[in-house]
Amino acid sequence: MESGDLRVFQMVAREGTITKAALQLGYVQSNVTARIQQLEAELGTTLFLRHNRGMTLSASGKLLLDYANKIIGLLDEASKALSSSAEPSGPLMIGCTQTTAAVRLPKLLASYYEEHPNVQLSLTTGHTQFLLDKVLRYELDGAFIGCECHHPELESYPAFEEEPVVVSAASVPDVEEAITKPILVYSTGCSYRETLEKWLRSVGVTQPVIMEFGTLEAIIGGVTAGLGISLLPRTVVQKHEAEGSIRLYPLPEALSQMKTEFIVRKDSFISSALRTFMDSFTPVKTAESQKSSLL
């Protein structure tokens, strides 16, 4: 069993089809198929269940994937450790939520790249649970997540604090009407969605109409058009409020701050590129929250 075969297996498991995996790897499909078949023959077990929609992991495949993630992660860490130098260089894969990418990251990344041009930065966005899983599978060097992290395999560092605010169209006159609207949110696993649903339950709305969106721009556009309400950082939407296109409602004090933390695996090697990146941000607090609360 070679590491290259495990990487092919890992990609097929992730993409769900030979075609997509081959495209991601830059291989021909027949090569990917042959390597999966060779791996199954070597291990004497079926790793994938084939069906019309693609391929899903068998019980043996799920077990192997856990080991493959660890082995590949350790090999990549060894490569980083051996090639690391005092001068930051090489790939640096960072993850963050879309709200963090919109407000906090542009200046931070631009400043970092200006100082360390030999680092190949890449940025992956997604909701908090997606990013946690990516870091745990060694697919990201680190990630900004929208909550406190207590996972036993992860180390977390405070990065930013945001003030979440309920956002509605400017035409919505008050919070009593706002809570009757659908909520526009990311998929399950988003900390802002969880906080919004928690607040709605506290004011008696237990089953809101939920509309899931894939991008921050789509959520803001839907809110502006009067489709529904959402919960977003004040720093993201204050420009829209100043333009008069939306209305903001502060949350009660107990929910008025959300922490953004930067997470890495505890067993990961911290390269010079990652260390200097982590040194480039410090805990930042937003302006003091308004004392008024909803309802």
Swiss-Prot record:
User: Could you tell me which InterPro entries the record lists for this protein?
Assistant: LysR_subst-bd (IPR005119), Tscrpt_reg_HTH_LysR (IPR000847), WH-like_DNA-bd_sf (IPR036388), WH_DNA-bd_sf (IPR036390)
**What region holds the HTH lysR-type domain?**
1-58
UniProt signal peptide:
none
Per UniProt, what is one GO molecular function of this protein?
DNA-binding transcription factor activity
Q: Which UniProt keywords apply?
A: DNA-binding, Transcription, Transcription regulation
Keyword Transcription recorded: yes
Protein family membership? Belongs to the LysR transcriptional regulatory family.
| Organism encoding this protein | Bacillus subtilis (strain 168)
- Name it: Uncharacterized HTH-type transcriptional regulator YusT
Which gene codes for it? yusT
Q: Which part of the chain engages DNA, per the record?
A: 18-37
* A Gene Ontology biological process term: regulation of DNA-templated transcription
